[in-house]
């Protein structure tokens, strides 16, 4: 009998996804808005992003298909492969970014060379992959409990031991841009969530638990980053830990949070690759992705990822919008064609619209209006085609 994951196990997986150095670093940007507006942007952005994340997870959970297999239902067997390739590329990028950030922060506490930390983190991710998602139970529970306690200590140091410092607000960083930066993080997990909800005993409940846990933890991480910049005047998390005397404990936060998050990226890259080439074994592709990501983290500087996050949004926001329209509104059956050109053209229109909206300062960012308009376009096109057939 196939082993299924419990609600608790799914919650742990997405807790690990949320506890991330990259999320803390992204949170530091929000200090430019001040605490009140910064917190509002974090909450609004995560609410938008997590609703989309939930809907994507429900599609995969109900159909028992991986994220990229569900994409084929809307875009055709070959059209879906286009998104699988784009997803693998973004996951290789994420793997490299996460290892780079983790190694940089770990090096700030215990200096042995950036490349050494890249290799250590990369090796631990490979161990996580080889253990496998359905066998991680007790290992993940211990790691998550330790991370949670240490993160609370970090929160206490920042918010209760620090004092507000003079932080120069950035007038060019608008509330809408901040919302978009908050939406971008849950949106980046959108092409992955079904890889985990499809394995759940209760897929819809597991999706709800996963989304809520990730949303709360991710907001908390953003808040820690923003608080670090506002209350300590320091955006380098490693230095905050050093000054607080966390030392080895801080090192553990950095290394294990990087491992538990990046494991999901590499694992899903493997699952997505199975949608491109049926003969590939996802677990071994995930190992290869980790190796490539480790090399990338050693060789290339990856300090500013905002453009990368916006690129992810422009590709995957209109993609899930088409899927939401097909699955929940139009209730279309699986596309039997190689390329569903109609949906691919709607996605392209959504992609272009997102890039255009990036030049317009909108209060709620560009993801929400882009997705609403893309869904509306799907419904209109379906109605017009239905009339022609009638």
Task: Describe the residue ranges of each PLM region.
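Extracellular loop-to-transmembrane helix junctions
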Residues: 28-58, 72, 79-81, 214, ...
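Membrane-water interface regions at transmembrane-helix termini and the short interhelical loops
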Residues: 29-32, 58, 97, 101-109, ...
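Membrane-interface "cap" regions at the ends of multi-pass membrane proteins
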Residues: 1-37, 135, 174-179, 191, ...
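Transmembrane alpha-helical segments of multi-pass small-molecule transport proteins
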Residues: 13-17, 83-88, 109-132, 144-155, ...
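Hydrophobic transmembrane alpha-helices that form the core helical bundles
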Residues: 80-112, 259-275, 318
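Membrane-interface loop-to-helix entry segments
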Residues: 116-158, 169-170, 207-214, 309-321, ...
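C-terminal membrane-solvent junction of multi-pass transporters and transport-like membrane proteins
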Residues: 170, 321-390
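Transmembrane helix-loop boundary segments of multi-pass membrane transporters
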Residues: 29-40, 44, 104-118, 134-143, ...
